[in-house]
């Protein structure tokens, strides 16, 4: 992911990361550095000779300097490739942290120049790229042959086997038009082979703080991840569109550029497209959230949520394919409120610009694709039906007194 591009290619970034590792030249610690490591810097290793600690001298042909005094109080397990030098790392807009590795356990890692790594319980099978910050974390690890959330099947609509799309980090919402109109083609095996890896990646200028577990995850450049739990996922980010994750729980999912995911929210088997927002304990499962849509407080399950939708209240959206978006969901709306007593084999197709009022109940099956920009009044229970009247107000029947003008009632 080129940091200067607004939406850089994830596929290219993973390939470049692999080639960068392949280009590394390294050496062993000198006798002077070894004495400093053991006595002055108080480092330890499972190998008493520290032969498992390798000092990076070149990356992509560029010579790298090493300062042994910047590595203190660490434990090294298996092969660790280091390159630290005196300097500073930007932390936010007005704070800088010293470049160093301190009080951390590292196992089978690559640490690139000018990083701040401190107070971490265990970092293993991880690539930490230039100008990154990793501090106060529990465990950062990676499984063998991980795909980082790519290829996970997202089942939307009919929960017994509806619209099934394998999500990938480079899947844009415009690309979904073909995928939703026909059975999606299988994934290109070469795409998955190119991104498959054995290492977590923390991209350049990224910051990871106080996370209990980061497992089999790619964190893109300029991303900021705080107090979160992330497993088998990818967090895309760039200098122009940084992604921020705070107090989140993310499993088998992909967050694209500019996403804000915070306030105790959680998602699983989902794709959050660029510039989506998730907050206030929102729950997202088996769903695709289109660009510029916000999910807050509510539950979204097995749904395709189109662009520019306001979903900011305690409400429920289940098994809905809202292709064109641009609508709103009011407080207490239950979209998918009935159950047949059998399998959950029904779905809803809202039209563009639909407005679901406070406390409405939408029973399935429901098709409103040909009723764009219609309003469901507050407290209405909409029985299973197909609506084909655009710009409608759907309300309960009212009784008029012929002797009084309706305007005065």
Indicate residue ranges for each PLM-predicted region.
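Short, T/G/N/S-enriched strand-turn elements that build extracellular solenoid repeat scaffolds
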Residues: 98-100, 117, 204-209
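Intrinsically disordered, low-structural-confidence terminal and linker regions
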Residues: 1-31
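An extended acidic
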Residues: 25-27, 32-66
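Active-site pocket-lining segments that scaffold enzyme catalytic pockets across diverse folds
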Residues: 202, 218
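Residue-level signal for inorganic ion chemistry
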Residues: 109, 217
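Glycine-rich hexapeptide-repeat left-handed beta-helix
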Residues: 3-13, 64, 69-71, 75, ...
């Amino acid at each position: 992911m080129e940091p200067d591009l607004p939406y850089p290619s994830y596929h290219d970034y993973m390939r470049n990361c692999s080639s960068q590792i392949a280009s590394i030249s390294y050496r062993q610690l000198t006798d002077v550095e070894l004495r400093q490591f053991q006595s002055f810097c108080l480092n330890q290793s499972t190998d008493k000779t520290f032969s498992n600690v390798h000092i990076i001298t070149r990356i992509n042909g560029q010579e790298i300097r090493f300062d042994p005094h910047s590595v203190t109080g660490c434990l090294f397990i298996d092969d660790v490739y280091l390159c630290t030098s005196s300097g500073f790392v930007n932390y936010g807009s007005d704070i800088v942290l010293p470049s160093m590795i301190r009080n951390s356990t590292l196992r089978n890692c690559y640490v690139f120049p000018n990083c701040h790594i401190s107070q971490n319980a265990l970092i293993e099978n991880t690539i930490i790229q230039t100008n990154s910050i990793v501090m106060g974390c529990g465990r950062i690890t990676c499984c063998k042959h991980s795909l980082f959330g790519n290829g996970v099947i997202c089942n939307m609509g009919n929960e017994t086997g509806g619209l099934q799309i394998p999500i990938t980090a480079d899947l844009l919402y415009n690309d979904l038009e073909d995928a939703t109109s026909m059975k999606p083609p299988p994934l290109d095996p070469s795409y998955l082979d190119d991104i498959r890896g054995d290492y977590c990646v923390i991209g350049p200028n990224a910051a990871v703080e106080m996370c209990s577990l980061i497992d089999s995850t790619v964190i893109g450049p300029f991303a900021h991840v705080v107090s979160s739990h992330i497993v088998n996922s990818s967090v895309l980010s760039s200098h122009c569109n940084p992604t921020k994750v705070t107090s989140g729980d993310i499993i088998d999912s992909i967050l694209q550029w500019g996403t804000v995911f915070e306030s105790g929210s959680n998602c699983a088997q989902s794709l959050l497209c660029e510039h989506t927002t998730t907050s206030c304990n929102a729950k997202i499962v088996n769903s695709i959230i289109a660009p510029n849509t916000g999910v807050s407080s509510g539950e979204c399950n097995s749904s395709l949520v189109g662009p520019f939708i306001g979903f900011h209240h305690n409400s429920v959206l289940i098994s809905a394919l809202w292709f064109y978006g641009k609508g709103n969901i009011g407080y207490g709306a239950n979209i998918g409120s009935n159950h047949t007593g059998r399998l959950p084999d029904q779905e809803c197709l809202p039209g563009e610009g639909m407005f679901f009022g406070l406390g409405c109940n939408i029973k399935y099956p429901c098709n409103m694709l040909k009723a764009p920009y219609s309003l469901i009044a507050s407290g209405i229970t909409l029985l299973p039906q197909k609506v084909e009247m655009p710009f409608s107000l759907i309300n309960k029947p009212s009784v008029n007194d012929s002797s009084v003008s309706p305007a005065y009632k």
